[in-house]
A protein has these predicted regions:
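Short hydrophobic transmembrane-like helices used for membrane targeting/insertion
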Residues: 1, 24-25, 31, 43, ...
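Small beta-barrel nucleic-acid-binding modules, primarily SNase/OB-fold domains
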Residues: 27, 32-34, 51, 63-313
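Sec-dependent N-terminal signal peptides
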Residues: 48-58
């Protein structure tokens, strides 16, 4: 600590009265103490921040597949799973596993819906889990949009476990954009093995040529597979027309063009490719899906030859 005689701008003058010198010294000491106190507070804040960063880094290392999808929000305990696979926590909150499309009482085979609920209950009930809260925090019904991670399980992510067992499929959402690639790969394995919902016609992939199947699923979340026969370009949208000629149209916002190209799916080269598209099916003016997220489009089978028509920019 600097003493008053050592402080810049402070000096003793013999001509000053003693009471003046004492007042100056008290003022200087208080200023110096204030500076030291502020420096100490800054150091404490820096240490707290570094500790928080270290804790966050430890969680990221422990749960690497979740790091891009959300933030750790503490340990919780699940005490119930309802028929829609919402998870009830001991603290009273309800958790919706974000980015998933799962069976429910009004959709899908009842035995598969029950198996999914039993699977989730066996995995979670009576155990502590790490709550990974996704962007947005809660939905319009007050449910916490999150994932639950079990450090001693494989996979640690409950959402990934459901996908791998075939009890859910990926439903692209803004909150899960960071881990969409990993989730789609896990889903692909369950679909190839025909697990769970992939045996159920209500959840199975619909071929673009199946007009009757498309009509029955109007207004619902679907996964469609088909070859792109033409790409149409407009000012704000792109139109991917799937075979046959009266097949589904995939409407893509032009703002996604760069993101699709960066992820290896340039729109101009999709003609002749077999793609898999997921989203809400609108059949009012012919079957169509509006694409709002790059993860809604996958290349199912890649070929080098062009399709029936070339894109018209």
């Amino acid at each position: 600590m600097l003493y008053p005689a050592e402080l810049p701008g402070l000096f003793k003058s013999p001509s000053q009265p003693a009471w003046t010198r004492r007042a100056v010294m008290r003022h200087a000491l208080s200023m110096n103490f204030g500076l030291a106190h502020r420096r100490e507070a800054s150091i404490r804040r820096a240490l707290r921040l570094s500790g928080a960063c270290a804790a966050l880094a430890a969680v990221v290392l422990a749960f690497p597949s979740l790091a891009a999808c959300g933030r750790p929000a503490g340990r919780v305990q699940a005490i119930g799973v309802d028929e829609r696979l919402d998870i009830e926590l001991a603290d009273g909150r309800a958790v919706r596993l974000g980015g998933l499309d799962a069976p429910s009482p009004d959709r899908g085979a009842p035995e598969i819906a029950k198996a999914a609920r039993d699977y989730l209950s066996e995995r979670l009930l009576g155990r502590e889990a790490e709550l990974i809260v996704l962007a947005g925090g809660t939905d319009r019904w007050g449910r916490t949009v999150a994932d639950l991670s079990l450090p001693d399980s494989e996979p640690q992510s409950t959402a990934e476990a459901l996908l791998g067992a075939g009890y859910a499929r990926v439903r692209p959402e803004f909150e899960t954009r960071g881990c969409a690639t990993e989730r789609l790969a896990i889903e692909d394995g369950a679909r190839e093995e025909d697990l769970g919902i992939w045996r159920d016609p209500d959840f199975a992939v619909i071929q673009s040529s199946n007009s009757a199947g498309l009509s029955r699923r109007s207004g619902r979340f679907v996964v469609i597979e088909g070859m792109v026969r033409r790409v149409g370009f407009a000012r704000s949208r792109l139109y991917l027309e799937l075979v046959p000629r009266d097949g589904p149209t995939i409407v893509v916002a032009r703002r996604l063009e760069t993101a699709l190209a960066r992820e290896g799916r340039p729109v101009g080269k999709l003609v002749g490719q077999t793609i898999r598209v997921r989203g809400a099916l609108d059949d009012r003016f012919g079957p169509r899906i509006e694409v709002a997220d790059p993860a809604m489009i996958e290349i199912a089978r890649s070929v080098d030859a062009p399709g029936e028509a070339k894109p018209h920019p």
